[in-house]
Regions:
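Zinc-dependent metalloendopeptidases
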Residues: 2-309
């Protein structure tokens, strides 16, 4: 009996293995490489090196506000120069990494993280690592805290007469995104002086929400799955875009990005907040698939400081 079972088991394996192999191949085919994957083979690079794809690293840092070459020849070459080293040190300081100026493992890992497309540094003025000391009155004493929120250049904000804002979705927006975005607006309303209401008038709404892909005409193209996830513009522009090519989910689901979490972050930009260096803050720039976050004290302090209340 046992001897007959072995050939039968082998026969089943011969039938199943090709199917499993095809499933694995199909899964690999569906998984597109991250736009930031090029960073992996640059790990260990430092000043003085000349390595293929360093120009892509320069472009990455330029996109997020860390680097700007007057001479475009240097921007497009693969030389690890003084400017690049300085930009990497600034990036490392912003993300609480050791400021070595080299592409060590921790720096590469952080740079490869999916993130918001809004720059960390805008025209060289807005720094995540600001570490602003604030005094918060508490009875007869002042509570001393260090804040890490930031603002857009010039500190744009909604006028005092416009504390109620309307928002609208682009007609045809996926139905499962409506409730998470509405909840995100409700959360900000509960923690600020703002109130929000949904309108069907997309043209005249104060804030517009849509899913876009690649170059969509706003000067900030998306880059496909796993790179930049969403972006929004400073007051009083009002545009908020999700990357349509990402996997999105209403719940915190492995392999997908949480719609409400990213909405909370981008609404922060819509209200005037830049990025924070506090990892627990909603305004921290990077997000992982399956991650769910809420507002942090630093986010709320930032809005209160910007609007002076």
């Amino acid at each position: 009996m046992g001897s007959k079972a072995i050939p039968f088991f082998s026969f089943i394996l011969l039938l199943v293995l090709p199917l499993l192999f095809q499933a694995v191949l199909a899964d690999l085919k569906d998984k597109k490489p991250s736009p930031f994957e090029f960073l992996q083979h640059l790990q260990g690079c430092h000043k003085g090196d000349k390595v293929k794809d360093i120009h892509k690293l320069k472009k990455y840092l330029e996109n997020f506000g860390y680097l700007s070459y007057k001479n475009k020849t240097h921007a497009n070459d693969d030389d690890f120069d003084d400017f690049l080293e300085s930009a990497i040190k600034t990036y490392q300081l912003n993300y609480h990494l050791k400021a070595t100026g080299t592409l060590d493992a921790g720096t590469v890992s952080k740079m490869m993280s999916p993130r918001c497309a809004v720059q960390d540094i805008i025209n060289g003025t807005s720094r995540m690592r600001s570490g602003k000391k604030r005094n918060h009155p508490s009875g007869s004493k002042s509570v001393h805290t260090v804040s890490h929120y930031s603002f857009f250049e010039g500190e744009p904000r909604w006028p005092a007469s416009q504390s109620h804002l309307t928002y609208a979705f682009l007609p045809g927006t996926r139905a499962d995104a409506i409730s998470p975005v509405a909840k995100a607006f409700q959360t900000w309303a509960a923690n600020t002086h703002f109130s929000f209401s949904r309108t069907e008038d997309y043209v005249n709404a104060d804030i517009t929400v849509s899913f876009e892909s690649r170059d969509h005409g706003d000067g900030s193209p998306f880059d496909g799955p796993g790179g930049t996830l969403a972006h929004a513009f400073a007051p009083t522009d009002g545009r908020f875009h999700y990357d349509a090519e990402e996997q999105w989910s209403v719940t915190a689901t492995p392999g997908a990005y949480h719609l409400e979490t990213l909405a909370l972050h981008e609404i922060g930009h819509l209200l005037g907040l830049g990025h924070s260096s506090i990892e627990g803050a909603i305004m921290y720039p990077t997000f992982m698939a399956g991650e769910s976050k809420g507002l942090h004290g630093d986010d709320i302090q930032g809005i209160k400081a910007l609007y002076n209340y």
